[in-house]
Amino acid sequence: MSMPATPPTRRPCRPSVPVRPARGPSARAVACRTTIPFGRDNDGTPVSWDLSAGRHLLIRRDERRSSPSVSLDLIAMTTLTGGTHDLVVVDPHRRHRWLGGSASLPTGPCCWATTADQITGVVAELDSPVVGPPRVLLVADLAATVAALDDEGRTRLARVAVDAREHQLLLVATTADTNPRWYPEGLIDAFDDIVARRREERPSFGLR
């Protein structure tokens, strides 16, 4: 699909959400080559994800009961150091605090939303018809994010996911339950790949 002709423009986040400029394109080629490993599937095939593939990824895991996801941290760092995409983080459990303003980071996410008001504001901005720069939306617990939104916000979130490519947006999210019945219509189906851990704790990789 061809990219929209609208020139990229940075749109501000809500004042309550930390805002920092994105890094320049000096590490663009490195970011495109970097792959994030997820172990092996049930057939022994290595499972990985990379930024340049442009595929929306959903990881089945419980953010409330698990330690912070190393894979999410790697995806965030790859995005931050690559210079090809801005990073927007929705983190309702505040599991990835280092993204919220670590002084040691040379740059940080465009937005780090943790409260219901902040999440609502981020979703509203992403649903805007104005096309911004390429972005990665990293959601640490999709179910909790949906629960934080009202009906209008949930409808907007589903629309953001369905129309993501038209807005140069790449989705990466975790959730404890991938059953579409618990989510706004079209939200789960918008993800291309789903990584799920079965009882034997071996990752499986589903292509959508």
Report each predicted region and the residues it spans.
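Interdomain "pre-motor" coupling segment immediately N-terminal to P-loop NTPase/helicase cores
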Residues: 1-23
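Generic recognition of long tandem-repeat/solenoid scaffolds
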Residues: 8-11, 203-208
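P-loop NTPase catalytic phosphate-binding loop
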Residues: 19-195, 199, 205-207
